[in-house]
């Protein structure tokens, strides 16, 4: 089976994939994007200098470095939420190494536009303010959400134990990457692509995900397989047994999509 490389989204880290790993049949690597010090643990809300400097390109380079270290020459690339920006950039840089792109309720802006422009309208101005604060050397609040926001955005389909897992690990994020233009030009249109649409998602609602799927169909083009799951945003935590069969099938071979 083709190895899986799992890329987390905003405010998350490799920790978010832990409940899923036991359900996977293929070798799997869950990566921590830089800065790694904020990916869970006591420093997850730290305002470190890298938050104002890192780019989507830095994220992609980190993923490729981790894949090299794991000995993965070719792999299925899975991106959750903000991780959609990263996996697209990895595929642009190293298209022959990516066997399949899997976007799990992932952000896919219009070509050359920022993640902010693909967000729900009510989140755009607060996120722009966070980016401005970070560029100005102030505290970076993106991902450092309060408990009420975390429960609403990520935990609406979780039991209390799963919710506690999120609350104890979710941290801050690189806000400036959300304002950076995102590109998919250079990804071969025939590279297999799957979008996992989450129907109960309160972070990226289902109707918004339809727009993101349309963006992916427009660029890089080609067929996009859409799989729907009746879950909230953090499906790998709340319903790992439902996401795993999708990834196991993809890792076992190319999907049959028209």
For each feature predicted by the language model, list its residue ranges.
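Gly/Ala-rich beta-loop-alpha elbow adjacent to hydrolase catalytic centers
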Residues: 78-83, 87
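Active-site nucleophile elbow and catalytic-triad environment of alpha/beta-hydrolase enzymes
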Residues: 168-187, 191
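Conserved loop-alpha-helix segment in the C-terminal half of the alpha/beta-hydrolase fold
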Residues: 199-230, 245, 249-250
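Flexible "cap/lid" loop of the alpha/beta hydrolase fold
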Residues: 92, 97-98, 102-138, 204, ...
């Amino acid at each position: 089976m083709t190895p899986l490389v799992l890329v987390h989204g905003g405010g998350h880290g490799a920790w978010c994939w832990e409940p899923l790993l036991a359900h996977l049949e293929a070798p799997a690597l869950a990566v921590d994007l830089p800065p790694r010090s904020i990916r869970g643990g006591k420093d997850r809300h730290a305002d470190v200098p890298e938050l104002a400097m890192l780019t989507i390109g830095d994220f992609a380079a980190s993923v490729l470095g981790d894949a090299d270290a794991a000995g993965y020459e070719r792999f299925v690339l899975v991106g959750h939420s903000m991780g959609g920006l990263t996996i697209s950039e990895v595929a642009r840089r190293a298209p022959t190494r990516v066997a399949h792109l899997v976007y799990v309720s992932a952000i896919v802006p219009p070509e050359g536009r920022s993640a902010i422009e693909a967000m729900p309208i009510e989140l755009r101005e607060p996120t722009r303010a966070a980016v401005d604060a970070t560029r100005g050397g102030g505290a970076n609040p993106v991902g450092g959400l309060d408990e009420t926001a975390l429960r609403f955005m990520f935990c609406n389909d979780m039991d209390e134990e799963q919710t506690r897992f999120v609350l104890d690990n979710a941290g801050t994020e690189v806000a400036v990457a959300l304002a950076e233009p995102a590109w998919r030009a250079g990804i071969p249109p025939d590279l297999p692509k799957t979008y996992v649409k989450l129907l109960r998602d309160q972070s990226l609602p289902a109707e918004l995900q339809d727009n993101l799927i349309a963006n992916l169909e427009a660029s890089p083009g080609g067929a996009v397989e859409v799989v729907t799951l009746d879950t909230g945003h953090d499906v790998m935590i709340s319903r790992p047994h439902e996401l795993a069969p999708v990834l196991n099938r993809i890792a076992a071979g190319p999907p049959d999509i028209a």
